[in-house]
Amino acid sequence: MAKPSVELTRELQDSIRRCLSQGAVLQQHHVKLETKPKKFEDRVLALTSWRLHLFLLKVPAKVESSFNVLEIRAFNTLSQNQILVETERGMVSMRLPSAESVDQVTRHVSSALSKVCPGPGCLIRRGNADTPEGPRDTSPNSETSTSTTHSVCGGFSETYAALCDYNGLHCREEVQWDVDTIYHAEDNREFNLLDFSHLESRDLALMVAALAYNQWFTKLYCKDLRLGSEVLEQVLHTLSKSGSLEELVLDNAGLKTDFVQKLAGVFGENGSCVLHALTLSHNPIEDKGFLSLSQQLLCFPSGLTKLCLAKTAISPRGLQALGQTFGANPAFASSLRYLDLSKNPGLLATDEANALYSFLAQPNALVHLDLSGTDCVIDLLLGALLHGCCSHLTYLNLARNSCSHRKGREAPPAFKQFFSSAYTLSHVNLSATKLPLEALRALLQGLSLNSHLSDLHLDLSSCELRSAGAQALQEQLGAVTCVGSLDLSDNGFDSDLLTLVPALGKNKSLKHLFLGKNFNVKAKTLEEILHKLVQLIQEEDCSLQSLSVADSRLKLRTSILINALGSNTCLAKVDLSGNGMEDIGAKMLSKALQINSSLRTILWDRNNTSALGFLDIARALESNHTLRFMSFPVSDISQAYRSAPERTEDVWQKIQWCLVRNNHSQTCPQEQAFRLQQGLVTSSAEQMLQRLCGRVQEEVRALRLCPLEPVQDELLYARDLIKDAKNSRALFPSLYELGHVLANDGPVRQRLESVASEVSKAVDKELQVILESMVSLTQELCPVAMRVAEGHNKMLSNVAERVTVPRNFIRGALLEQAGQDIQNKLDEVKLSVVTYLTSSIVDEILQELYHSHKSLARHLTQLRTLSDPPGCPGQGQDLSSRGRGRNHDHEETTDDELGTNIDTMAIKKQKRCRKIRPVSAFISGSPQDMESQLGNLGIPPGWFSGLGGSQPTASGSWEGLSELPTHGYKLRHQTQGRPRPPRTTPPGPGRPSMPAPGTRQENGMATRLDEGLEDFFSRRVLEESSSYPRTLRTVRPGLSEAPLPPLQKKRRRGLFHFRRPRSFKGDRGPGSPTTGLLLPPPPPPPPTQESPPSPDPPSLGNNSSPCWSPEEESSLLPGFGGGRGPSFRRKMGTEGSEPGEGGPAPGTAQQPRVHGVALPGLERAKGWSFDGKREGPGPDQEGSTQAWQKRRSSDDAGPGSWKPPPPPQSTKPSFSAMRRAEATWHIAEESAPNHSCQSPSPASQDGEEEKEGTLFPERTLPARNAKLQDPALAPWPPKPVAVPRGRQPPQEPGVREEAEAGDAAPGVNKPRLRLSSQQDQEEPEVQGPPDPGRRTAPLKPKRTRRAQSCDKLEPDRRRPPDPTGTSEPGTD
């Protein structure tokens, strides 16, 4: 600071400093101020950084006047130490005490002005030309220096402070600090108003005004911030003054409609304007402004490189003027690289767009072109681009436009020509454009012919491609090799994805795939699509790196895809957002992350994930060291935070910590990857190897004594194969251990250690050279200080200690960081090599073992055939059949259990299946999954629907399921094969007759009549039966033995759940005292020699089935059981009947039916088959079928068909009576007498059959069921059948006699039903009233029969049949 004048007292100086506390006082001079012409008064001149102050010579000091340096218009130095200052408010003339004081004031003002308005030369004009100017110091630290090269950010802070002082506003120090620190550290030349959006509009205006005098910043940026009028005025002022501002971005800044017109005028004023990038998007602009701007752009000598006018409401007229400007100014053809006219509807729909098309058709330098949402005609545009933009265009966005205005079916030629000729395209966006099928084909054909492009991103989302587009993609996409990223979201593919996904997998150049919003299908189809997708990403040569199924609403079935991510090695990024997979999906994702080592990025949100789901992810990331990025799930986190804030915050912090840890170089756990691959490679084929080795060993032992040389050679080869198979178990760990041992001291580590040593020496040498160079330069610039420092011995010794780099740091950087990354990659490659070698060897061993097994089995068969003795056809045939059966069993077991063809593809398929995590219980328990699983086992869909849809348990026998047909069933009623009484009415013409299923087996061969006869008479029914899977009570809820939940049981209670089965009501005599009382049947007579004990039917042949069939389920009257299936019956076993006794309780379960077994007393060719169906050719068979069809057609009639009137309400049994009947069942059973009748054969054999109770329910229950038939539903009575010899129907009235007669009839009588004319000849008919002891075939009831009263049935049984056919038939 200049020395103050001697006249100024100390007190006055301190008072002036206190008055100017806001700014530091740099100089104080005692001057003579000219107040009037030639009249001078004493004043004090105080100089601060940006202002000159005049004080009176009084204490306390008071400012008389002041002015800012920016107010100075002229500063003249006159003779006699006088200066004349011209300001905006007037002239100021003062006389200083000395020439030195004049020089100090002059330098101060010049320095301040140079900081605010930097420029060359002196800003002070000398009034006396004879007086030479003194020497000017131009050093960087001099006060008169005008150089701003070394100032921070071009002196923005000083300019801003001067402008604040000039406008009388407070200077924001935070603005100065941000610019001097942050902008300077980043070397950022873009001034972003968003960084100071928290300040007032006046502060923003001053900052923008400071840019007018600043040469550092070249870009002014403002987006999504509404600017006031003050700021916009300063923007225009800055553009009119600045010579360094090159780019202006005012995107959605709230510009007025006349701003562009003012901007055009500013461009005309500033001849030195260097602006070359202009962005005015999302601001309304009027046509007048566009016209003015177009006129000014004609004068731009260098044109514009970037012009963004998106969503500016530009009219076609303004576009026409703009296009003409582009064509008139030749600079635009070489300078314009970025053009954005998007979001202006109707802009290119008129003829005014031809001016723009003309510019685009000329050779130009466009790189980025965005015309989305402008209603442009794509084929016309591509025709223009074909001539002018093929060589430079990289980004093309034509979304939300129309393809062509023509309605022809021919593809526009421009599609194929342009996309086959483009050289540098990397992004093509055609989303929300309804592409015709031919246009899509032309597009794909053009890309397939283009050999210049690679890694092209093609966006075809929301194009409504649907099935036709999917078909075109399947046909054409395989030949397209330049597309690296394909977006097919929201195209309505749906079920077409079943064929499209495999087609996408054939394109090996595809790296990124987007398939969201295409899964609007049913659950079963959705699972099939997801399995196809899983199969795609599990292929060994899969090229996909990222997969997106965002916003597909997959819900819980997202886990099907997630389960395949665990062992996946190709995907690095996956997007699962918007699928609503909930916490279960998060848990499945956590399990996948625990073993995955390839995923780097996961995007997931909008999945209804709570804090518990995030906790599962956090725990999984503790063992995952490869995931680098996980998007912040805003929706799910906010929802979880509302319910559990503390837990959500802790869990997310843990997730972020794991991600930060994974972004640093570290050792990856290779042991985990080793164990995973070992399980996938070895476990997939180990069981198959064991089976094949066991089979081959058995064959080797059987053929070891064969003297044939070829056989011995094959035996030797087979032994070698078995040895290789045993050694292959240790192949994988041995190879991995070998690679691990060699890698510890391998050449890579040795080379890294040597490089670390060499780098340490090079670092020391470089530091030595740098130190010597710096010291020499310091000695040159400051020689005196260097001599003093060397004299004190401080310089070189202190610096040498600071420039040393520890060798441990270099070794750690190379070996622990870079070396560890190299080692991790090396371990991955090593593991892949081990996996490949092991898989190849195991595949070869399996293939050779399989061929050896086939060859040895063939030799064994030939030897057994030759060993049969001649002349013994029976024995030889038996031996041959045994040999064939054994060999056939070997071969069939191998083909079925080990795969129909043991080749490399089969092994790969099994390994791929093992890589995928099995479906969880919450998905597999669904009906859709059950149907699909049963379909894979050969069971038609819906087979278990009658049993409640429960899953089968593992305890049940599933052996019979393999014998069921694997093809689908036609939709037929479950009870269509139920026995029907003969009908004479012809069937309806609409339904074909179905053959009786009991006459043929499933393979189409005729059933043998004596099939299973020996087993039938040698096995027990209940206790000793091993193939009967379960009792009836365990079968009823489903095939599962677990009890049903209460809710499900409650739902199964129908309106008629309290009804008992009709078999319980049919045995009561006509004079029963209690309505609904059910008495048990008497036990059958003791067995005779002609009728041995009956065996267990399920063990007979291949026709037995351990499960309930639909026919068996439907054999009861609907409405009397409360639900489908035999749920009302009691358990079998000791509760219903004793093991040694024959008569089981009426609640005994209905056994599975046996096909093809002819019992004594019932000729197989003439009677009923044991599955309850008629068999045998003849007119009666056809008539029965026709009658049944007509009955079914009448039953299925619509609401308008005739129905019988229900019985009166008084005749219906009460619920309490039925409950009492059930409670007294066992008492009535014990009190029933035993009836023994010596009836001749075959009646005795039929009676013997009753010993086993409900072995064949369709033969024991008709007597009871017949009484429940509604008279209105039986048009004619069945034909009477002869009463067996030695048996008379009971005629005595009374309760006891009627009860005994009703109970004895089912237990003893086995009537011969009249089925054909041949049977009629053998058994003459006996005409007469129906016998209560006789039974007829059960009729399929209608649901209205449930109302039939038990009291009503008793007199009806004794009533003779009505010749009109309206009375109820008897019990036959």
From Swiss-Prot:
Ranges annotated as biased composition (Polar residues): 1233-1244
Family, as annotated: Belongs to the CARMIL family.
Ranges of Low complexity composition bias in the record: 138-151, 1099-1109
Record's compositionally biased regions (Pro residues): 982-995, 1079-1098
Region called Necessary for localization at the cell membrane, residue ranges: 1040-1073
Biased composition (Basic and acidic residues): 1163-1177, 1219-1229, 1348-1361
Native source species: Homo sapiens (Human)
Domain notes: The C-terminus is necessary for localization to the cell membrane.
Region ranges (Disordered): 126-151, 865-900, 970-1003, 1024-1372
Keywords attached to this entry: Cell membrane, Cytoplasm, Leucine-rich repeat, Membrane, Repeat
UniProt KW Cytoplasm keyword: yes
The name this protein goes by in its record: Capping protein, Arp2/3 and myosin-I linker protein 3
Main location: cytoplasm
Signal peptide: none
